[in-house]
């Protein structure tokens, strides 16, 4: 089980989507220079399918995507939540921002429509910087994903 601390509607994290961002706590990555160090501690409320249903009801018609920000402490649970959302709320896309270098082999990529991989490395910058090590992928077909990171770069 994972906990979340807060949520927010965001427009930049996933291109062409109005995204409900869910900040998951207990991050094991501990990236130096992290701008969300408050998410390192395992605090907040349990993130359950019932909580997701409430978010969807609260933002009905306003969001097109739900993004799990973190969850690296339990990727299998993040995948289960993604499966639940696709089954119960098929109109929504599901994204996962992970600090991992690679996608965990123990879960299915196709449970997600978007996946961000890579730890934050301060001197390389975040996704909007051309120098970033992080990558944002969009599902193309099946388990195939296309790198769309360049869509986030500052012009």
Q: How should these model regions be labeled?
A:
Residues 1-23, 28, 36-40, 155:
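N-terminal [4Fe-4S]-dependent radical SAM core
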Residues 2-9, 36-95, 101-107:
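Conserved Radical SAM active-site core
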Residues 7-16, 60-61, 78-80, 91-155:
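Auxiliary Fe-S-binding modules of radical SAM enzymes
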Residues 22, 31, 115:
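Conserved, mostly hydrophobic/aromatic
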Residues 24, 68-69, 116:
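Short glycine/serine/threonine-biased micro-segments
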Residues 27, 73, 120:
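Hydrophobic pocket-lining residues within nucleotide cofactor-binding pockets
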């Amino acid at each position: 089980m994972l906990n979340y601390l807060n949520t927010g509607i965001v427009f930049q994290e996933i291109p062409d989507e109005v995204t409900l961002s869910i900040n998951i706590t207990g991050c094991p990555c501990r990236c130096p220079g992290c701008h969300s160090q408050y998410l390192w501690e395992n605090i907040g409320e349990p993130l359950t399918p019932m909580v997701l249903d409430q978010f969807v009801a609260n933002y009905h018609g306003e969001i097109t995507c739900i993004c799990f920000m973190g969850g690296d402490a339990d990727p299998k649970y993040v995948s289960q939540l993604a499966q639940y959302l696709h089954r119960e709320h098929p109109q929504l896309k599901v994204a996962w921002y992970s600090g991992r270098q690679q996608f965990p082999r123990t879960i299915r990529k196709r449970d997600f429509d978007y996946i961000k991989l890579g730890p934050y490395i301060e001197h390389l910058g975040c996704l909007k910087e051309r120098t970033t090590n992080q990558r944002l992928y969009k599902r193309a077909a099946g388990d195939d994903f296309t790198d769309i990171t360049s869509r986030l770069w500052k012009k």
